[in-house]
């Protein structure tokens, strides 16, 4: 990017309308958050080795920790209320910024663990099948004998042998790539968990949103289908991290279904905008740090109930008194702002869930920092970090979520100016703008936005274009002149 003093007016204007246009809250970066030691060490090494932004490395690390826990841990407050570590994170970032590299080491560790578990369970299933086949042969012999003699003792022996048969272990599938409602519900019924870690994935479809909101809250879910086996999910656990292109990210978090389903309040959105990505070439991670990351994820996986035939109860993570007081004070502050005329009123549904988000983030940091058998409560500094992270996500909710007509107006103004500046039009007709933005905004919204932009001298208005008396076709309307037109530039 050019230094500000040498930057052409067109690019200055484009940066202004992308980042600083009046009416938007400033979205804060996660790189400003002070992280605890182990998390900071691993995330910094991932960012450096993979030549990706620190923010994306952190956004890949935290869901990986939650995924490795597989729903085994619960954060418990002094009043007895519990919170699982289910996480929904939606990330928008431009192509080439390094989204796939943020997850590749964690995915490799999960894949290796799953492959090893497959081998162990496959061998065990072969032994079970052989034992069952021997029982079947014995039952066949006894069945012939019973048919001849009718002895009750033979029949009892047949029943006893049938009860000795053992079922096969289910083959574990930790990660899920299909985002359809049918795939998610079936995976939850089969395994009790559904985990997606997608570096360039598909955001949730409408039919899956209700299922995911209930899973995030840990509610009991029953499925009754004529075309598939029925099932009940008693204690669902879901981790859904999707990194995608900015256009898909913005469209998704502003769809009415996303807002009305309650998924918005349960999702942590993050849009990475800084185009100054690291210039270094990617390199392998430091073996010592990678070994510690692998040890951490594998210890969590092995301690979880996933793949266990006799699962234990949930691991409880208590919260220290100081940390709970810190959470309560922040919660009261957020609630007071949401009830007033502050910007938090616009996203009060998300504000109501912020204490839960903070507890889940604190739980993930706790699992990362301490051994799996650690029994001490979450300390206040760790809770402070989680609260800071929650407020960063809040800033992205405020920045990118369209909730009322004021948001529509601001977004429409930005869309008009970005379209004109990116195409580098010297002049453009009102009709062309309405056609270009017809899938996002009503024609009346575009007209109002143009009126505002002209009144603020962001655009200059020319005389209406006339097509001539008797000539067919829609009038072209006003001609708008771009004061930032770059004669030596090109469109992009």
List where the protein language model places each region.
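Phosphate-handling catalytic cores of nucleic-acid transaction enzymes
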Residues: 1-492
């Amino acid at each position: 990017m050019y230094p500000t003093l040498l930057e052409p007016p067109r690019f200055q204007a484009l940066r202004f309308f992308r980042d600083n246009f009046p009416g938007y809250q400033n979205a804060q970066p996660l790189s400003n958050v002070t992280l605890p030691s182990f998390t900071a060490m691993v995330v910094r090494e991932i960012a450096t080795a993979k030549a990706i932004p620190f923010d994306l490395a952190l956004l890949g690390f935290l869901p990986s920790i939650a995924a490795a826990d597989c729903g085994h841990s619960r954060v418990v407050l002094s009043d007895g209320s519990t919170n699982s570590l289910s996480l929904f994170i939606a990330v928008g970032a431009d192509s080439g910024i390094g989204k796939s590299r943020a997850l590749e080491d964690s995915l490799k560790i999960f894949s290796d663990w799953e492959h090893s578990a497959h081998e162990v369970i496959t061998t065990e299933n072969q032994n079970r099948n052989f034992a069952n086949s021997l029982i079947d042969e014995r039952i066949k012999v006894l069945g012939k004998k019973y048919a001849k003699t009718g002895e009750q003792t033979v029949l009892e022996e047949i029943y006893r042998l049938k009860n000795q048969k053992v079922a096969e272990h289910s083959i574990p599938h930790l990660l899920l790539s299909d985002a359809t409602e049918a795939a998610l519900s079936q995976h939850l019924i089969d395994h009790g968990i559904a985990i997606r870690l997608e570096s360039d994935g598909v955001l949730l479809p409408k039919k899956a949103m209700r299922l995911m909101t209930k899973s995030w809250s840990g509610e009991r879910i029953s499925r009754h289908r004529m075309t598939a086996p029925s099932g009940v999910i008693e204690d669902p656990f879901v981790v859904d991290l999707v990194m995608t292109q900015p256009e898909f990210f913005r469209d998704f978090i502003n769809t009415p279904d996303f807002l009305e389903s309650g998924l918005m309040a349960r999702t942590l959105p993050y849009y990475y905008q800084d185009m100054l990505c690291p210039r270094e070439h990617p390199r392998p991670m430091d073996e010592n740090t990678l070994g510690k990351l692998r040890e951490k994820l594998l210890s969590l996986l092995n301690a979880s109930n996933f793949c266990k035939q006799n699962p234990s109860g949930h691991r409880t993570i208590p919260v220290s008194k100081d940390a709970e007081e810190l959470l309560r004070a922040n919660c009261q502050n957020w609630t007071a702002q949401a009830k007033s005329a502050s910007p938090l009123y616009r996203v009060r549904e998300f504000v109501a869930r912020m204490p839960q988000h903070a507890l889940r983030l604190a739980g993930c940091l706790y699992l990362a920092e301490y051994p799996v058998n650690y029994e001490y409560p979450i300390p206040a500094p760790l809770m402070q970090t989680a609260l800071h992270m929650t407020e960063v996500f809040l800033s992205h909710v405020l920045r990118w979520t369209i909730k009322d007509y004021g948001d529509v107006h601001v977004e429409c103004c930005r869309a008009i100016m970005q379209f004109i500046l990116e195409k580098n039009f010297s002049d453009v007709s009102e009709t062309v703008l309405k056609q270009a933005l017809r899938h996002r905004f009503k024609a009346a919204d575009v007209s109002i936005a143009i009126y505002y932009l002209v009144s603020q001298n962001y655009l200059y208005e020319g005389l209406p274009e006339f097509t001539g008396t008797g000539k067919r076709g829609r009038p072209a309307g006003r001609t708008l002149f771009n004061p930032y037109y770059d004669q030596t530039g090109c469109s992009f």
